[in-house]
Curated annotation (Swiss-Prot):
Lyase keyword on record: no
Source species, domain of life: Bacteria
InterPro entries: Pept_tRNA_hydro (IPR001328), Pept_tRNA_hydro_CS (IPR018171), Pept_tRNA_hydro_sf (IPR036416)
Organism listed in the record: Rhodopirellula baltica (strain DSM 10527 / NCIMB 13988 / SH1)
EC numbers for this chain: 3.1.1.29
Enzyme class: hydrolase
Cell location: Cytoplasm
UniProt catalytic activity: an N-acyl-L-alpha-aminoacyl-tRNA + H2O = an N-acyl-L-amino acid + a tRNA + H(+)
This protein's name: Peptidyl-tRNA hydrolase
GO molecular function annotations of the record: peptidyl-tRNA hydrolase activity; tRNA binding
Amino acid sequence: MKLVVGLGNPGRKYDQTRHNIGFMVADALVRRYVGSPPTTKFEGEISECRIENEKVLVLCPQTYMNASGQSVRKAMDFYKLSPEDILVICDDLNLETGRVRLRRSGSAGGQKGLVDIIRHLGSEQWARLKIGIGRPPAKWQVSDYVLGKFDKTELEEMEHAIVHSCDATACWVADGVTEAMNRYNAASGT
């Protein structure tokens, strides 16, 4: 069993915002693999699907980005999962818009949702799939930028990034993090 966590903020006002790209990928993954309708559990919405005969739980914490760790910890404890069974999908300001990068482990890189997950799990040893949203224009506050909606051009780039992220996630489930990194990090570029 694997746990895929899409990070974002709950509520319609955050739909299609840069910070919610993790939710967008999670939703696309559940649609692609005909997952179960989401149920409310672990302070999040969780669906179940099968990828390459592996049971995959797809969790979207409803605690807001900065408190995502408590939801992830509850799901991990309930299903008795190890950090190697988890993939967290989130936005990254330090990657160009639409670029996808999978990592085996590492620091939060300033991403507040990842910071909270590291705090709750007591470890950085879990995979993360980061999707570039680029840097804010001059004079923009970072918070306004990440909570802002994608413009039309960005949304087109994100549609490709979402497909690429779903492919990379399926490879991670079926073939492991090393194979997924080798196959999808090189192919990502915009």
